[in-house]
Amino acid sequence: INKWSEKVEKGKIDTPVDGLVINYDDTEYASTGTVTGHHATRAGLAFKWQDEVAVTLLDHIEWSCAASVITPVAIFDPVFLEGTTVTRASLCNISEMDRLGIGEDKHTKLKIIKANKIIPKCVGVVSAQGHYTIPKVCPVCQSKAKILVGGDGKTKTLHCINTTCPAKNLRRLARFVSRQGMNIDGLSIKKLVILINKGYITGYSSIYELYQYEKQLY
């Protein structure tokens, strides 16, 4: 374990790895153990490496609407993590922003990781400047936005209350462009959210009119 941990820490492994699994070198003995819902035997142990942490400066907070939920996203100075450059991370909801104690000014210092070596995540605030402001309107349709409290009585999320907001078409649009639908390459849910929030996609037909925004997209 120490040997492989040292290799990972010193960057001596060419292929990105997120953990280490140790198995018994005895299949007969391994078969005598119990099983789990995910594994055929308990013949091994899995270890996860400690997440690499980067400190960076917040540039601004972007609010993105998808299926009526308006999510805060931290946009920050580029940092190199786990083999890629990262510039943004979801802040989940208002409650998470409060827990982190995030500010909104450019001098706010953030701690960023890649959860499971994939998803950028803000895990802490080194120092905060200013205080974030919650938008009063939806960034997509400009209708009134409302803070709702979840069933746990604690989690606060921001929602667009316009029943005809284009962002509420996300699931239908995702099905439309999927392999089972029109099989349109390059339009993932993540990209659909961006294009909807920019006002480039408002319905099915607008997907075929994206050429109008070619200069903005490339």
State the predicted function of each range.
Residues 1-218:
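RNA/tRNA-interacting regions in translation and RNA-turnover enzymes
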